């Protein structure tokens, strides 16, 4: 049985998905132990392997849609668009057509890599005075003043124009079907709605918290207005969102609530193709987004780690975790001081990534004591920054695909906070993000709000190359935890010899502001005690939670070409391959 309105080409994968959803406490064991038995590390889920194509996405239905596209001969980008559309429907609090997106693209034929910045800009009215005249000392975290132009739809269209092969309208069919006819509410979705939906406006509460409670698990959730908007985008492309009826309704809605966006700001939006930043680490070339994202912090984190013998420290020992936490603080101090829209402010990337500078920075780690306050390496510390945030709300989805032609995409899209601005427009079904709340009003700061400026972004999709060929794609939701989780997983994979799934499932830390560190309870108590003795303020997190992101990866075996896809059990991500 399938849901009414779902594409028939997805039916064969329902059985496969059901098999894949069955978790295991440990890998399958042979019936009899051989004389030279291999030791298999326990893992929660299996690695998923294939030889033609693979996907990993933030929800099983999205992964299903992406694999169907690949099996129908589509490109990795085609699969990404299909998955992105579905995720906009089935994870509405985390991402959607009202949010932003970024992607990194590997061309299997040429080995070239390019990146797409799909973040939106502030409105023409968004001067510092616009906010200060309302007696604001900072931009609100929710509401109309927190909304910048949503860039995700333009990013889908621009990615498809360059790297897609299937008709764009066909790729949005699964998303339109789920929005119009409904999809089953999961336990995780109901929990997220319950915990994050209280700040929604009345239309948002009516849809996602009917009667004051989350929809029952297993019931069908519809957003027919969003289905209509997605159909407009499928039929009309850019005009269906940025210049037509949808743009007029969204701009009028925002203006009525006191925001700075107008219909002209929607019409002026465009994505930007950029060159990714590149850093060499552990015999791989790592590619990340340039500013306005925190990708530069990812590379500086890696470069500083070179000065420390990671393998000798040992996996998840107190010395290893302490070193990683302290290096993160140094990377984030520079990030918070300098990362902004390079079209509107000077971002000294070369200096921030200079190896000699970072070697000196790495030497600041005190092996015997955690640092509570860390200053940037140059430039004064910005007000209101503390080298990270404790917010762990569900705000982002990551998705990745590799196709039979050797092309790969590492993609991420987001509403920023859970349910973004809290504003659902009932006419269009669009939930608006709140990325515009990340501008600062601080005079002279590179990220100070200004007309037509992109805000600072935490979104960090990543890709790794080995001798010019694709090694793996990787990414995770989780705000400030993205940079931290990704380096821990890279170490697990390349230093400590774990499989992709093992690397993702291994216990992680998340350093927030000051001395605060969240740590998964699977880290031994003796290590917890040692970290406390070093001055870290530990919060021990039980079980598998979204605090530590929800990482996904596709790894290419350098000898056989076999694809191994992995997905984090901490959220709803699933991987499929064929």
For each predicted feature, which ranges?
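Bacterial N-terminal signal peptides that target proteins for export
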Residues: 1-14
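C-terminal motif of bacterial Sec signal peptides marking the signal peptidase cleavage site
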Residues: 21-23
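Internal maturation/activation junctions in enzymes
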Residues: 212, 307-414, 428
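Bacterial signal peptide processing site
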Residues: 25-27
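Active-site rim segments in enzyme catalytic domains, especially the processed small/beta chain
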Residues: 89-114, 260-262, 407-472, 496, ...
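Extended C-terminal subregions enriched in glycine
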Residues: 405, 453, 486, 495-546
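Short, small/polar residue-rich loop motifs at catalytic or cofactor-binding pockets
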Residues: 273, 393-396, 457-459
